[in-house]
A protein has these predicted regions:
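Beta1/beta-strand and adjacent pyrophosphate-binding region of the FAD-binding site
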Residues: 2-14
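N-terminal FAD cofactor-binding segment of flavoenzymes
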Residues: 20-82, 394-405
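Dinucleotide-binding Rossmann-like beta1-alpha1 core, especially the glycine-rich loop
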Residues: 50-61, 85-101, 105
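Helical element adjacent to the flavin cofactor pocket in flavoenzyme catalytic cores
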Residues: 99-118
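Predominantly flavin-linked oxidoreductase catalytic cores and closely associated redox partners
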Residues: 112-286, 291, 295-306, 310-311
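A glycine-rich dinucleotide-binding beta-alpha-beta segment and adjacent secondary-structure elements
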Residues: 297-363, 370-372, 390-407, 412-418, ...
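Internal hydrophobic alpha-helix adjacent to the cofactor/substrate pocket in enzyme cavities
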Residues: 369-391
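C-terminal auxiliary extensions adjacent to catalytic cores
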Residues: 412-458
Length: 458
């Protein structure tokens, strides 16, 4: 045990990952979480590390951006990845979890850690007299949001996240729904709902015309203006700046008749056993729990009114009698103007004792948020030790994300892990095959990351 003491605000993925890592170094951590005294509009559970948008933590292959990120996290000692293994549900080549089991496992690890003291109460003030890590998430509001705004001297930015509905397995029509993964890769962990052309066109028309739920003042900031994309009938609605990775399905439908067919409803790699042919379009369902009694509708984040969700989504083949245990919702996502206010060590340039982690920084995604918590914790601990860590190599996934976060950008938007932010390979070492190229980039990243860890041993 050391004499160091640190405050962490927020027990989401980033806050829990940071608190557990710091506690593992002997630091005494005071972890503050506002639930259950106060819930954000999107959170329902009292547990820590609550997953909202999806139960998928994305791909595990090293030659994928998400898989590479996970490998770098493992090398930093991620406890959330260990918790994810406990809560794993089958999802082909992806790491998906039972949300409740995952949250319970993370909560257990935090509450049983002797170096972490949990305070179930909101915080309204940031004390700069000692290092503090703010990981309060994308729905930070109230006096704490005002405090952050005062520290950064910047109007907070915002965009919108949307959540997909969940249906019961027993309510599905298995004469139409079939189990398969694309191209037969891995186990048949997804259920598929195949459309023919006429069914799809009717569904698209109904979806494009469906009535959306009004956004609350906490979401819109009480601002009203025209939506950037008119719906199929040319009507306008409230403007929202939507993160592409959580795009509401109705906004996608408004972009064109085939947009969904080349997005979440793409039929490639699938054959409908009832016809022997590839469907015109296809909706996938992914298990929400280990028992596979619940499924979420993949890619169907939405802000439709609940009655409209039931009416329109029951037009999906196999979901005609679907029982919805959760409807989709839409909520605001608040984040810093990171390039202007954050250093490469994830602390405020003007207030170096104040560190930030998670989605509030502009890291977008579950695992990205957790990775950010690990990185911020390492930098904070180095500060306690009187050191400053050198920047992460830009050819690592974590390094590329931090570089994106802290590089000047007049139209800064959150970013998740993707191979496109890694620097290209030298021409003479650049395979033409994309999968081989990604593997070469991943192997380079792992080597660079391990070297950085060795050189900055904490």
């Amino acid at each position: 045990m050391s004499d160091y003491k640190v405050t962490v605000l927020g027990a989401g993925l980033a806050g829990c990952e940071a608190a557990l890592w710091l506690a593992g170094k002997g630091v005494q951590v005071d972890l503050y979480e506002q639930k259950p005294m106060h819930f954000s509009p999107a959170h329902k559970s009292e547990g820590f590390a609550e997953l909202i948008c999806s139960n998928s933590l994305k791909a595990e292959r090293l030659d994928s951006a998400s898989g590479l990120l996970k490998e770098e996290m493992r090398r930093m000692g991620s406890q959330l990845l260990q918790a994810a293994e406990v809560a794993r549900v089958a999802a082909g080549g992806a790491l998906a979890v039972d949300r409740d089991t995952f949250s319970a496992e993370v909560t257990r690890r935090v509450e049983e850690c002797p170096n972490i003291t949990v305070h179930r109460q909101p915080v309204e003030h940031i004390d700069e007299s000692a290092p503090i890590l703010v990981a309060t998430g994308p729905l930070t509001d109230g006096k704490l949001a005002d405090e952050i705004g005062a520290l950064t001297g910047d109007e907070r930015l915002h965009f919108y996240d949307a959540v997909a509905p969940i249906v019961t397995a027993e309510s599905l029509d298995y004469n139409k729904v079939f189990a398969a993964s694309r191209y037969g890769r891995g186990d048949a962990d997804y259920l598929n709902c195949p459309f023919n052309k006429a069914e799809y066109e009717a569904f698209h028309a109904a979806l494009a015309a469906a009535e959306r739920a009004p956004l609350h003042d906490f979401d819109t900031g009480a601002e009203q203006s025209a939506r950037p994309d008119p719906d199929a009938h040319g009507k306008k609605a409230d403007t929202v700046t939507v993160y592409e990775g959580c795009m509401p399905i109705e906004i996608m439908a408004a972009r064109g008749a085939d947009t969904m067919r080349f997005g979440p409803l793409r039929p490639v790699g699938l054959v409908d056993p009832n016809t022997g042919h590839r469907p015109w379009a296809n909706v996938q369902l992914r298990a929400e729990n280990k028992e596979r009694t619940l499924y979420n509708i993949v890619g169907f984040q939405t802000n439709l009114k609940w009655g409209e969700q039931k009416r329109v989504f029951r037009m999906i083949p196999g979901l005609e009698h679907a029982e919805f245990v959760r409807y989709g919702v839409m909520h605001r996502n608040t984040f810093l103007d990171a390039p202007r206010v954050l250093s490469a060590g994830l602390c405020l340039k003007e207030h170096p004792n104040v560190f930030f982690a998670g989605q509030i920084t502009g890291f977008e995604g579950y695992m990205e948020s957790a990775a950010c918590g690990l990185l911020a914790a390492r930098n904070l601990y180095a500060r306690l030790e009187g050191r400053e860590l050198p920047p992460l190599p830009a050819d690592t996934m974590c390094g590329a994300l931090v570089q994106y976060l802290t590089t000047e950008n007049k139209n800064f938007q959150p970013m998740g892990a993707n191979m496109g932010i890694l620097p290209p390979l030298p021409e003479d070492k650049r395979p033409r095959d994309k999968r081989l190229r990604y593997m070469a980039q991943a192997e380079r990243a792992v080597a660079s990351f391990q070297q950085w860890l060795d050189e900055t041993a904490l």
